[in-house]
Amino acid sequence: RARVTDAFGNTLGGQTVSVLADNGATVASTMTTQPDGTVEISVTSQTAGTSTVTATINNSTLSQNVMFIADVSTAQIASLEVTQDNSVADGAMANMLRARVTDAFGNALAGQTVSVMAGNGATTAPTVTTQPDGTVEISVTSQTAGISTVTATINSSSQSRDVTFIADVRTAQIADLEVTRDNSVADGAMANMLRARVTDAFGNALGGQTVSVLADNGVTTAPTVITEQDGTVEISVTSQTAGTSAVTASINSSTASRNVTFIADVRTAQIASLEVTQDNAVADGAMANTLRVRVTDAFGNTLAGQTVSVLADNGATTAPTVITEP
């Protein structure tokens, strides 16, 4: 309310007062005093904060400050931005987002409660409160690698953003090692196969990890293999030695072993040796001379259950076939 008087304090009605207001406030540019010399000045604004209102007549001026406050009834999520992404999915390292709450005209709203939700198993505080500038930091952790959708809500206003958690290579481990093909021929070409799977401590698949491989009993394998995006890698092992071989996959201090079996190659069965074990028996049709035959494949692996044909000349008698022992 402005009051206009003459130099001796007498009220002056019908006087035109010029009015100005800053900080985006709106006011009538001139107003006229009532008979009692006063005039009500109405000031509106869509901008929260202090506005200086100045009333002037002739060369006389007075100013007062008025305050406009943001409209909590129209509180909304004005923005939601990711400020830190690609944190390790260890349940401790956090991805960060910043929400900003304003009223319908963009004025920052402090002290507002924002509800927060996060998908894919991520953990976050269910509510956060805005600072004086209308912003609030949102911390999200997870033990699950992948994308988590974070949603901030106030009133009926919501915004969502995706954050990514990555598996923790520091805790890489052999989660499992399984035999996918066994009992291959010990010919140095046919392979037994195993599949290793590498994860972090929380079971998240780790791609691009180098796994060391060892195999005993003369088996040949690549010394290292690299995991695919799903954390798995195929391990191929070959051998020229029949029998059981232990295959061991290692990463960091984590190790797993499985046995595979190579079998002798019946396709290359051969008489490896034939030796006389008893000689000079009496020729009475009963006392026998004996021999021992050994059958192997091309790489010297013994072959059991193989039928060997036998011939003897000069009238000697023998079984026409014999079968090799284990």
Which positions does each model-derived feature cover?
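The feature marks long extracellular or luminal low-complexity segments
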Residues: 1-326
